Amino acid sequence: GLPICGETCFKTKCYTKGCSCSYPVCKRN
């Protein structure tokens, strides 16, 4: 399935694979 990217960025990192930081939350790449 597709990654769920709802977590808050840690600095500029997202821990979920396939997600990138769109501050303050992570978005799917």
UniProtKB/Swiss-Prot annotation:
Q: What is known of its domains?
A: The presence of a 'disulfide through disulfide knot' structurally defines this protein as a knottin.
Q: How is it modified after translation?
A: Contains 3 disulfide bonds.
This protein's record includes keyword Disulfide bond:
yes
Keywords (A to Z) from UniProt: Antibiotic, Antimicrobial, Disulfide bond, Knottin, Plant defense
InterPro entries recorded: Cyclotide, Cyclotide_sf
Source species, please? Clitoria ternatea (Butterfly pea)
Pfam families with a match to the protein in the record: Cyclotide
Disulfide bonds listed in the record: C5-C19, C9-C21, C14-C26
Q: Which GO biological process annotations does it have? A: defense response to bacterium
Q: What does this protein do?
A: Probably participates in a plant defense mechanism. Active against Gram-negative bacterium E.coli ATCC 700926 (MIC=0.5 uM) under low-salt conditions. Not active against Gram-positive bacterium S.aureus ATCC 12600 up to a concentration of 100 uM under low-salt conditions.
What's the protein called, per UniProt?
Cliotide T15
The Swiss-Prot or TrEMBL record describes its family as follows: Belongs to the cyclotide family. Moebius subfamily.
* Coiled coil start-end: none
